[in-house]
Amino acid sequence: MKKLLLMGFLISAAVYGEDFQVQTIGVAGKYYQSFYKSDKKIIPVPLINLNYNRFFLNGVKAGFTLYEEEDFKFSAIIDPLGGYFDGFTVKAKDMDKGYEKIEDRDSKFMYGLNLDFNLSENVFGNINYMFGEEGDKGEAYLTYVGYITDRLVILPSISAKYYSDDFVDYYVGVTKKEVLENEKIKKEYKGDNSFSLGASITAEYSITEQFIMSAFAGYEYFDDKISDSPLIDKDNQVYYGVGFRYSF
């Protein structure tokens, strides 16, 4: 098949050719101010793309290719850390004073379907829909690949995400128990269907043929069904970071 760039949550990319597959292993550090009333966070982001026949590992998501054509690939995937890389997970101990007795919002195992596709030589996209114990979510991405030099590539990207009412309620809903135990929470809150819109840019520089350095930054806006929760500090999240990966 023609070149197909497949990106994970941030910048885990693999390039497929007609007779070869490029495997990558690496890690990035992502820094962001959580939209919760909590501390800033730094989290590791795995930059992994490993493939064996129809099986693959992209970041922490494992999958199996169900159908593949020249410009698209349809897969079944699982995500053992659903909600984590989106910024939805939070520990009570990390919340601001007056909110630190809430229940932890943990990552959840999720499963679903994934579609990677090319729109042109320089534009590729991804659509996926995931189901889980605490609700479901859908994501859509479009990314442009700008080749600046033989070593430097710029990748601007836009995204739209949907969150079901159960997903929103688990992460930003507030129970009566939490109102009673946290002095700054004054009311219960029931989550509803919501969405977010995002934009990001990534720069990738090939130090050698195998070692690649990446720098990225992004912005995500959250609908008021999320931002109106008593647990939420603002309706947006800004993040940035750097990463390194090895290709073989």
Segments (PLM) and residue ranges:
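Short, solvent-exposed loop/turn segments at secondary-structure boundaries
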Residues: 35-40, 128-130, 228-231
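Predominantly the C-terminal beta-signal and adjacent terminal strand-loop region
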Residues: 206-248
